[in-house]
Amino acid sequence: MEVLYSISKTLKDARDKIVEGTLYSNVSDIIQQFNQIIVTMNGNEFQTGGIGTLPIRNWTFDFGLLGTTLLNLDANYVETARTTIEYFIDFIDNVCMDEMTRESQRNGIAPQSDALRKLSGIKFKRINFDNSSEYIENWNLQNRRQRTGFVFHKPNIFPYSASFTLNRSQPLHNDLMGTMWLNAGSEIQVAGFDYSCAINAPANTQQFEHIVQLRRALTTATITILPDAERFSFPRVINSADGATTWFFNPVILRPNNVEVEFLLNGQIINTYQARFGTIIARNFDTIRLSFQLMRPPNMTPAVNALFPQAQPFQHHATVGLTLRIDSAVCESVLADSNETMLANVTAVRQEYAVPVGPVFPPGMNWTELITNYSPSREDNLQRVFTVASIRSMLIK
């Protein structure tokens, strides 16, 4: 894997900097690195593809070295260099695609394609290594079963979940009380509602709670908390739990009371925030507990009083909500996030070449299913294919 990254980094630099008119002295280091790669690769043969519709391709290396000059690089020099560079780039692209289509239930962190296994051989250790990539650094750590650490922005840590629970209901669904939520990506939105606006609740107050367990623990997280859940702020028709009917939800938004956010790790509370909104931090957690209250306003203008009558029909439904968004965090496991295209890159290649469903990844690389059942085997394979995708993205956009 280090060889693949180092070759790709050198190729990217060579493609970007070896241009007509450039002084040789300005690019001599890159040219010497590329020549080292040529010397190491010459005389070797590789084969890629042969899975799904990814075609089998054979690769042979027999290239002359790029020469030296005291002057600027001319058109002939650049054309010769480009021909060699483009062949190497095409080779790396196919090695990456081959690797991204393969998976293994055992030791999925290790190279799975014949080409990348061959590149891992001792003869290629002469290539000048560049391990500056976060993915390569963490791949090396994971390969040695040491602790890894990925920095994510808006990590897709929450499997998609959208549902509701009713603490009070009737066959007519005309006086409901309960909780509804939407968990997806890096965001939780949860709303508590009471058609009667807590008229018969103790102290005219309803208590709500929403607990979310993460599939992987996060550390040093920066989080935003807002006293609102905008996705539940407009009228909607909702299917009943048994699917036999539908019911109408017509929210009127109140501010939540006694808001408490707890971050837990292995059942132990690590951080607690009460009535704190905006930006907060959480040190280390695998569970989030949100609790909040809906309190019937003790004093209301006639217009507000008309919204919340003391008897049916309840045409407007008192609602309070919270939004929790993970803006950034560190995780030992690889995840998809908003800053990178690794999941899309891997999925696109597997779809384009009709890669059959293997023993590890779900059909279509369905992220919700993948993260819901994030086994060690999936973690190893995902880190490997994401590392390869990060290498490919340097050369192929």
From Swiss-Prot:
Residues annotated as binding Ca(2+): N266, D286
Keyword Metal-binding appears in the UniProt entry: yes
Keyword Isomerase: no
UniProt-annotated location(s): Virion
Biological process, per Gene Ontology: fusion of virus membrane with host plasma membrane
Alphabetic keyword roster: Calcium, Capsid protein, Intermediate capsid protein, Metal-binding, Ubl conjugation, Virion, Zinc
Pfam families: Rota_Capsid_VP6
One MF annotation (Gene Ontology) recorded for this entry: host cell surface receptor binding
Family matches, as InterPro entries: Capsid_hemagglutn (IPR008980), Rotavirus_A/C_VP6 (IPR001385), Virus_capsid_a-hlx_vir (IPR008935)
Record's comment on post-translational modification: The N-terminus is blocked. Sumoylated with SUMO1 and SUMO2. Sumoylation of viral proteins seems to have a positive role on viral replication.
Annotated GO CC locations: viral envelope; viral intermediate capsid
Record: residues binding Zn(2+): H153
SUPFAM superfamilies: A virus capsid protein alpha-helical domain, Viral protein domain
Chain segments carrying region Interaction with the inner capsid protein VP2: 62-73
Role this protein plays: Intermediate capsid protein that self assembles to form an icosahedral capsid with a T=13 symmetry, which consists of 230 trimers of VP6, with channels at each of its five-fold vertices. This capsid constitutes the middle concentric layer of the viral mature particle. The innermost VP2 capsid and the intermediate VP6 capsid remain intact following cell entry to protect the dsRNA from degradation and to prevent unfavorable antiviral responses in the host cell during all the replication cycle of the virus.
Note: The VP6 trimer contains a zinc ion located at the center of the molecule. The zinc ion is not essential for either trimerization or transcription activity of the DLP. Zinc-depleted VP6 has an increased sensitivity to proteases.
Name assigned to this protein: Intermediate capsid protein VP6
